Amino acid sequence: MARLKDVYLKTVAPALFKDFGFKSPMQVPRITKIVINIGLGEALQNPKAVEAAIGDLTMIAGQKPVVTRAKKSLAAFKLRQGMPIGAMVTLRNDRMYDFYDRLVNLALPRIRDFQGLSRKSFDGRGNYSIGIREQIIFPEIEYDKVDKIRGLEVAIVTTAPNDEQGFALLKALGMPFRD
């Protein structure tokens, strides 16, 4: 079992149950999945960019990503329907907890001038999104082998019905928020 899952089950879930006064243990918010996405605008000029991004995402997530393709053609961007424009991976269960643990304890502290994450990135339904500007903050990525610095988005999906409960869950699991 993942270390963070054990922490959640033994300390975080009972504390949230008590704090919010839930009637059933199934009401306690939990993380359901983490979606990591890399959008590749340069994939139109450089088809090898998709393969490089897939390699980076595989190293970061520990799981093979799926290539995302354009839904519609857009003449302004010289984009045709079905062209590869990104890569994404959905993590659940143990891989999700392992990634969250590495994100909070290893990757985020390596960001330059890191002051903590904003509380405003919740979506109103308890889900949290983080934009990361450089994939090299993850220890799995070797700086010398990176062809281009790319950003990525991390969406943390929870069962929390509102931002207050989502914030309490992520804060209890060690997310470094700005106060």
From Swiss-Prot:
GO terms for molecular function: rRNA binding; structural constituent of ribosome; tRNA binding. It comes from Herpetosiphon aurantiacus (strain ATCC 23779 / DSM 785 / 114-95). PANTHER family: 60S RIBOSOMAL PROTEIN L11-RELATED. Coiled coil: none annotated. Keywords: Ribonucleoprotein, Ribosomal protein, RNA-binding, rRNA-binding, tRNA-binding. This is Large ribosomal subunit protein uL5. This is one of the proteins that bind and probably mediate the attachment of the 5S RNA into the large ribosomal subunit, where it forms part of the central protuberance. In the 70S ribosome it contacts protein S13 of the 30S subunit (bridge B1b), connecting the 2 subunits; this bridge is implicated in subunit movement. Contacts the P site tRNA; the 5S rRNA and some of its associated proteins might help stabilize positioning of ribosome-bound tRNAs. GO terms for cellular component: ribonucleoprotein complex; ribosome. It holds the Pfam family Ribosomal_L5_C. It comes from the Bacteria. InterPro entries: Ribosomal_uL5, Ribosomal_uL5_bac-type, Ribosomal_uL5_C, Ribosomal_uL5_CS, Ribosomal_uL5_dom_sf, Ribosomal_uL5_N. GO terms for biological process: translation. Part of the 50S ribosomal subunit; part of the 5S rRNA/L5/L18/L25 subcomplex. Contacts the 5S rRNA and the P site tRNA. Forms a bridge to the 30S subunit in the 70S ribosome. Belongs to the universal ribosomal protein uL5 family.
